[in-house]
């Protein structure tokens, strides 16, 4: 039997994990951009291609060339991180539960991590 308090506490803990993981990734991204100008330039271009993709998609234009360029930039960024000895996924968000990305839900389904936390009454862990 689930207690409402335990469920709320489990959701709060999972939310804190998500917020913390995202904040840590933001810090790593900022550090990388300030230490490695080539990565900062790629990030700047990625922001531009992302906006351009959105505009083209809304206008019904051909997004394939920009989509390819975006993928090239992401691959180049990951290669640079490897080259710098950081690991390609260094700036990625490191979620406690990669299945739900620390939301407690996969789509509209309650994730295993939230179920387990509530079921065993370990929301305080």
For the regions a language model picked out, list residue spans one by one.
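Non-transmembrane amphipathic alpha-helical segments
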Residues: 35-56, 73-76, 80
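Short, flexible, mixed-charge glycine/proline-rich loop motifs
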Residues: 84-94, 102-105
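Short, charge/polar-rich alpha-helical segments
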Residues: 1-11, 17-44
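The −1 position to Zn-ligating cysteines in a subset of zinc-ribbon hairpins
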Residues: 96-99, 110
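Conserved small/polar residues in nucleotide/adenosyl-binding loops
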Residues: 123-125
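Amphipathic alpha-helical coiled-coil segments
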Residues: 70-90
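Cys/His-coordinated zinc-binding microdomains
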Residues: 101-104, 112-117
